[in-house]
Structure formats: structure tokens, C-alpha cells
Amino acid sequence: MQADEISSIIKERIDNFELDVNVAETGKVMAFADGVAKVYGLKNVMSYEMVEFDTGDRGLASNLEESSVGVVVLGAGKNIKEGTSVKRLGKLMKVPAGDALMGRVVNGMGEPVDGKGAIETTEYRFVEEKAPGIMQRKSVHEPLQTGLKAIDALVPIGRGQRELIIGDRQTGKTTVAIDTIINQKGQDVVCIYVAIGQKESTVAQVVRKLEEHGAMEYTIIVNAPASDSAAMQFLAPYTGVTMGEYFRDNARHALIIYDDLSKHAVAYREMSLILRRPPGREAFPGDVFYLHSRLLERAAKVSDELGAGSLTALPIIETQAGDVAAYIPTNVISITDGQIFLETDLFNSGVRPAINVGLSVSRVGGAAQIKATKQVAGTLRLDLAQYRELQAFAQFASDLDESSRKQLERGQRMVEILKQPPYAPLPIERQVVVIFAGAKGYMDDISVTKITKFEAELYPFIEAKYPQIFEDIRTKKMIDKETEETLSKALEEFKTVFVA
């Protein structure tokens, strides 16, 4: 081999030489217990930055102290021990978003847990995102129908609203949420159901119900079950809302349900106490209000300049023995735009959905209600309140005057009309027709026990003989003189058939 050949080979080698060095800031675990690692080093780590242990586990830098960092481990972290090496990843947490997630079940970090393979998406978004400001928003003005008569007529929800569902355990809170998801079929609304600290079997049941009704194809489920670490339960709602924001920011509509935020607060309390943050009322940390406010403020109706998309939130809170004045319930009530209050007594007496009409309000939904519903249900709230008052009075007074007795009987029928079986949401035009029938006295002489049968037979009758009524309410979104006359005629005709 010639000398010049050798020198050219050496030159080529030098030219092609790449120094492949990875520079990463590292630290060492000083102590690890209850899913939290105390790490020495990582001087320049950011708050909530992702870090990686050499065991492969990942964590979030939560407490930034002078000489150490409190890292919340995501997952079990079984192999982490004192002396384990930790390195900064230099990035904040991101989760997948987009249409590829529909029909899937993911964990608190957005990883699939349904055995249907990887999620094919290129869209990743930051979990912690600032909520839209005042100028980026628009007031709530389009209805988001739940398919439940008691809600759509009395506590209407609009797109971009936050409406709290609150009640004791076993009062049908999740059922209201599932009904709302089922009712979004064909409405072009993407639904996200976040299960926090639930039993795996309960979540499996929810998935099965949604599949039965063909609702899973437009639904994403984020599941952080009771067996998951507190950190995963804390993360799940933020993961869910990040997925929802993708649709909101792309001029589409989404609905997110947090089931439930009581367990979310408990998971955060557990995390904070392990991180040795000072406890406050009910041992919750001082920033538990901010925990929920920064989450719920991300639900919004976005301005026309930004595409007029929306993200509607239905947080659920579980109360203890009806105590709405506890810390977390009052916090969330003050953050949301109204609440649907479910009562054990009503549930047990057969009024389902067990909505207490007196305590439930919707602070912005009225602007989103369609005119037809306003026309038939305008005085319904007041009538029901007067009925409740009369009912209490009638227990003691035996002799009631004629008008009071009529009011009582009408009230009983209205309560009966507002009852509804689970997982059977009603289209708005049917709701309008049946509430019209009740409010205008077409059911006054029908026995209370036959109201359900009356309602069940009324829809097919109108569908067969007067289909124009449903069509008009659907398209005009109001009852004009002509529709009212046709509807009155149809009800008179149906009543003679029904009574006979």
C-alpha cells in the first residue's frame, strides 16, 4: 500500500469521524417511598419537567427545593432505589391528540390500555396549557342537549359551559353523564370520559354500555383506576382536557366528563402530603382550588376568529350525606356555571333522574336553550316549586280548595313526565311535545300511573299521523301558531284513542 493511499484513508476516516456524545444533567435518588423520589442534583430542572430514571421509569419534577427535587414517579417504579441515576429530559409532558384516539381507552399518560395496538397520530400536545383569555372566548349560545327532559327543560347546558353534576353515591351521576354521551350521536360532538379512581369493572361496564349504543366510535376514555398511583390519577383529567382542546382549537365541538373530581382531589392530597407540602382545610393542600380551576377554565366556547369551536365540561362531585358545603364541593360549585343536584331521597322514591329542581341551576345555559323548549318549559320551574310547597302543606291540611287541588294534580303529572329510564335519551322535539302536553293540561284527567304509557304511545302516534310536528320543531326550533294548532289537534285525537 502506497504512502499517499494510507494518508488518504486516514484523511477520510478523520472527515467521517463523528463524536456522538449525549450531554444530560443527571442526579441521584436519595430516598424513594410511596411513589415519590427525593433526587439530589438536577440543578436546572423545570417545574413539572419530565425526568427519566435509569430503570426506564419516568417522573415529573414537582417540588423544586434548594438542594433536592421531589419527583413524582409515573407508574409503579418497582426497581427504583437509593442511588438510582436520574436524568433530565428537558421537556414538559405531552400526550397524543386527534381523531386516532376515538374509540380507544388510554391511561393517564395517553398510552393505550385496550389491547388494540399503538395509536397512530402525529399530533402531541402539552398537558399543562393556559386556558383561553377573555378576548379568545365567546358567550355560550348553542345548546348541548343531554336527552334528559329534566335537564334540557330546566337546567339547560350550552356548548362551552361547565355544569357540575353533584350528589351522594348511588344517585345516578354517571348515568346522567353516559346518557349525555349517547345523545351526542350524529351531533358531531367528540366525547371524552375521564374515569378517576374508579373500579376497573365499573369502567368496563361504561365501555360496554357505550359500545351497545354505538357511542364508542366518537368517544375517548381516559382511565386512571383506583389501582393506579396517585400521580396517574392526578394527571388523568389534564390528559383528557388536552385531547378535548385539540378539537376545540380545530373549530370542532367536544364534551368532557370528569368522573369524579372528589377522587381527583384526594389523589392530589395524597401526592402533596407525601411531598411534605403543608396541609390546609380537611388536610388538602392550599392550591387545591387552583388544581380544579385551571382544569375547568380550559373548557370554553372559542371566538369566531379562532374557529368558534367549543369544549363543554361536566365535572362530577360525590358528596357525603348530601353535604354540599364541604370544601371540594363548594370550590367546584364556585368555579362552574351551574350545578345539577341529585338527591338520594328522590332516587329512592322512584324519581329518576333524581334531579332536585329547586337546587339545580344553569347560570348561562338559558341563552343556549332553543325557543321551543323556552315556550313549553318557561313556567315549569316555578310550577314545580309551587307544587313542592303545596305538597308539603297538603300533608297536614285535608281540605284543599279546587285550584290548589288542580295544581297538586298537575304537579304530580309533571313530575311523572320528567321521569326517564336510563340510557334512553330523548330527541329535543319529543321532549317539547310531551312537556307541551303536560303543561297545557292534556294529561290532567289521565291517571298518574298511566302517564308513562301515555308518553310511550304518543310518540309513535304523532310519528305515524302527524310527522310534520316533529319536523317543524326540529327545523324551526320554535312552536309557531300553525304548529301549536296541529299539535293541539293531534293531542286531542290521541287522547280519545288512548282513553278508549
UniProtKB/Swiss-Prot annotation:
* Record carries keyword Nucleotide-binding: yes
Membrane topology annotation: Peripheral membrane protein
Which reaction is catalysed here? ATP + H2O + 4 H(+)(in) = ADP + phosphate + 5 H(+)(out)
Q: Name one GO molecular function term.
A: ADP binding
Q: Which GO terms describe its cellular component?
A: plasma membrane; proton-transporting ATP synthase complex
Swiss-Prot/TrEMBL keywords: ATP synthesis, ATP-binding, Cell inner membrane, Cell membrane, CF(1), Hydrogen ion transport, Ion transport, Membrane, Nucleotide-binding, Translocase, Transport
> Does the keyword section mention Ribonucleoprotein?
no
Q: What class of enzyme is it?
A: translocase
Question: Which positions does UniProt annotate for ATP binding?
Answer: 167-174
User: What Pfam family is a match, any one?
Assistant: ATP-synt_ab
The record's CDD domains line, in alphabetical order, gives: ATP-synt_F1_alpha_C, ATP-synt_F1_alpha_N, F1-ATPase_alpha_CD
Q: Where in the cell is it found?
A: Cell inner membrane
E.C. number = 7.1.2.2
- The UniProt site entry described as Required for activity is assigned to 360
What does the record give as the function of this protein?
A: Produces ATP from ADP in the presence of a proton gradient across the membrane. The alpha chain is a regulatory subunit.
Describe the protein's quaternary organization and the partners it interacts with: F-type ATPases have 2 components, CF(1) - the catalytic core - and CF(0) - the membrane proton channel. CF(1) has five subunits: alpha(3), beta(3), gamma(1), delta(1), epsilon(1). CF(0) has three main subunits: a(1), b(2) and c(9-12). The alpha and beta chains form an alternating ring which encloses part of the gamma chain. CF(1) is attached to CF(0) by a central stalk formed by the gamma and epsilon chains, while a peripheral stalk is formed by the delta and b chains.
Q: Which family does it belong to?
A: Belongs to the ATPase alpha/beta chains family.
Q: What is this protein called?
A: ATP synthase subunit alpha
What is the species of this protein? Wolinella succinogenes (strain ATCC 29543 / DSM 1740 / CCUG 13145 / JCM 31913 / LMG 7466 / NCTC 11488 / FDC 602W) (Vibrio succinogenes)
